[in-house]
Amino acid sequence: MANIYRDRVLNQVTEADIDSTLRVAGWVENIRDHGGVSFIDLRDMYGVLQVVIRDPELLKGIKKEECISVSGIIEKRDEETYNPKIQSGTIELDAKEINVLGQVYTTLPFEVMTSKEVREDVRLKYRYLDLRNQKVKDNILFRSQVISFLRQKMTEMGFVEIQTPILCASSPEGARDYIVPSRKYKGKFYALPQAPQQYKQLLMVSGFDKYFQVAPCFRDEDARADRSPGEFYQLDFEMSFATQEDVFRVGEEVLSATFEKFAPEGFKVTKAPYPIISYKQAMLEFGSDKPDLRNPLRIIDVTDFFQKCTFKPFIGKTVRAIKVHAEMSKGFHEKLLKFATSIGMGGLGYLEVLEDKSYKGPIDKFIPDELKEEFRSLAGLEVGDTIFFMADKEDRAAYYAGMIRTELGEKLDLIEKDAYRFCYVNDFPMFEKDPETKQIGFTHNPFSMPQGGLEALNEKDPLEILAYQYDIVCNGVELSSGAVRNHDMQIMVKAFEIAGYDEEVLKSKFGALYNAFQFGAPPHAGMAPGIDRMIMLLTNEENIREVIAFPMSGTAQDLMCGAPNEVTEQQLREVHIKVRD
C-alpha cells in the first residue's frame, strides 16, 4: 500500500520497475564508499535493495541502522555487479532524495548483521536490534507461519479455538506458580496458569466436543536449552468421548502435517502411526523416557546373567549393556571412560569379541568359560562387536546407560542425520514414592485415569498402577504430554486419597472440577505439543530462546525491559503486601 513513506515494500521492486521513479523505506544495513559513488544496502522486513548515491550531499550524516525513506529511479545493474544472494540483485535505486525517518543517536552496541555471534545477555538487552538480523527475524516469521498452519489444521479437523483465563486459582500441579496478589481481596492471590488443564476439562463437561488453543503457560522453573523460563506456548487440545488411541491419531495427523510442510528440504519425517514405547521399555532400551530413535543403539538387561558370575562390582546390582559394532582405538576407550566418570560412574567395563569369538577386556576373566556361549547368545554378539557395561541401582544404571548410549551414538557418528523421528511413550506409573519423605504422590498429571480404574486403586500396590498417560517425543525432545482424564468422581477421590489428599482438599484445591463432575462428565482425553520446542527442532536451533521474539534470559530476567523490577510502596500497600528482607 503506497503512502508518504514508501510506494511498495522491497521484495515487490522488480525489473518491471526499471526507469520508474519509486519511494522506498527501510533501515541502512551497510554503507560502502567506492570513490565518488556510494552504496547503501537498504533493508526492510521483506528484502534488501541496493541504493546508489552519486551526490555526496545526500549521504551526509547518515549512519548505519538509521531508518530512512529514499526516492529515486530504478536502474538495471551492470551484469558484473549482479548479486544473486538477494531477490533484487539485478537492479538498484539511483537516489534523488533521502529523508531520515528515525535517527541513530548513539553508538550501536553490536553489528546487526553478526548479532548471533554476540554474548546472549547483550543481544537480549537490545533485542529490538537483534531482531533486525535476518536469521533472527526469519525464526520469528517462521514461527508465525507454523502457528498459522497449526490453527488452520486444527480447525479443519473440527476443533474449536477457545481462549481460557490467564488469571486463575493456584493449584498443586507440580511446578511453582507465578502468583498475583488481589487488591480487592486482602491476603488472596490469583495464579498464572501452568496450563489450561482444568478449564479445558470443564469445556468438555460444558458439551464442547473438540477444543484447542495456542495456549500461553506460566511456570516458575529454571531455564534449560529446551525450556524457556517464565512462559511458553503449547498447542493445547482436548476431545470428548475419546480414547488414548483417538488422541494419538490426532497428534500424528497434526504433527506429521506440520513437520512435512516445514521441515528443511531433504529431511525425513516418521510416518504415522508412530511407534508406541512403554515407559518401562523406554527406560530399559534407551535409558530415558525421551528416546531418540535416530540412534540405532539399544540397551539390554544382563542383570540375571551377572549374578551367576564372579565380578563383585556387578553382584546385587542392576546391570545394563550396550553392544556396538565399530572399531575403537585405545584413545577412544580412554575418552569414553573419562566421560563415564564425569557423569558419576566409577568405571566402564567392556568386552571385545575377537576373530576366534573369544573375549578381550577387563571383565572376561570373571565370566566362567561354561557361561561364555550363553552370554554371546544373550547379547547377540558377533565378531568385531564391543559391549559396554553399566551397573548400579536400577534408576542410576538406566541413567548411566542412556548417557553412554547417547555418547557412543554421537562420537561414533551413528545418529541418523536429517530426520525427525517421532514416538509415543505411554504406560507411565500413576504414583511414585518420594525418596526423602517416603510419601506416595502423583508422578505426572493428577487428573489422569488409572489403568484398571477403581478396582486397581483398591486392590493393587499403588507403585504398580499404570496411568493412561503418554508423551510425544521427537529426536529425544519431549514435545508433548497428555492423558486420558479421570472423569469419574469415585476414582478421582480414591486416587487423591492414595496421594495424600483427602476429599476436602480435592474440593478446596480443585473445586470447579469436583463440582462439575457431579453433573455428567463425559470421558475425555487430550495433549498439548509444545510450540516453542517444535519450532526449535524445525529451525535446528540449539537454544529455545532463538525462536521466541522476546525471551527471558537463562536467569529468568527480561534484560530489555527490566523485569522483574521493584514497585512502589503505594503499589505494595494496595495489594496488602509487605516485602521481607
Predicted features, each with a name:
Residues 1-581:
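Class II aminoacyl-tRNA synthetase catalytic cores and aaRS-like
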